[in-house]
Amino acid sequence: MSGPDAGPTGAPAGGICAVVLAAGEGTRLRPLTERVPKALCPVGNVPLLDRALARLAGLGLTGPETVAVNASYLGEQVVEQVGTRAHLSVEPDGPLGTAGGVGRLRDWIAGRGVLVGNADAYLADPAAPPGPDIAALLHDWDGDSVRLLGRPAPDPTAPGTFDGHVFTGFSLLPWRLVRDLPPVFGDLVRAVWRPAEADGRLTVVPYPGTFVDTGTPADYLAANLHAAGDDSLVDPTASVTGGCHRSVVGAGATVAGEVTRSVVWPGATVDAGERLHEVIRTATGLTVPAA
């Protein structure tokens, strides 16, 4: 549908909302996530959650009537980070999974199609800014089928693939499949995606850019290095008097030693004489190898 009554990228006006899933514990990223929720871990000096919200804003999806964020693990930090930018759904008894998180928001979704994004997905397309880079997911959607953003899988027959593609963080769900999701633990793969695939009602929309699932320290480092490009990415408020090579240095950090292919979190310190290589250094002094 297009024309003056159309919403983002051709979707019916008022017919699309978005949910960012930010409730997970990030167990594979521990110990980085022992004090900071995975959704707030910075990539390229920007929290992953803020990257997701910026991508939605690039599609014209903003504000608490249109965008929701769920929270559970260290949820108070997520709530503070979101502020008034989105509707908040706090899961007090632990994360409800991807399906349960959406199911808990049924009254808020209220008949709309819903664009569901994983806060921990890092996406970057040099040909398009955040938002327009995933606009094909919404373009000419029929409002009834399921769409997944994906990229070709190295092994198209591997478990977990959809039509030979690996899921890359965003899906589009019709209300008819959302309205019956219970607010109990469950995942979208089994509750929605596979049944829709079996019914011939699932389509994969290829994503042409880079995707990194930041689930492990190695992948988290890879996402940061991609965000930095061929050089280092240093926040203007950081102090770097040592060496900095292909690294990301956050706000208020101090680097007097030498860092190579590493991430220095906001407020962290690398003392003179220290040499960091392929690690993440946090503000508490924790050093996590990315190998």
Where are the model-predicted features located?
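Conserved beta-strand segments of alpha/beta enzyme cores
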Residues: 39, 85-87, 201-203
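Active-site regions of enzymes building and remodeling cell-envelope glycoconjugates
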Residues: 84-89, 157-164, 262
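Gly/Ser/Thr-rich beta-alpha loop segments that engage phosphate groups in nucleotides
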Residues: 25-28, 99, 171, 217
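Conserved N-terminal catalytic core of the sugar/cofactor nucleotidyltransferase
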Residues: 2-21, 28, 42-127, 281-291
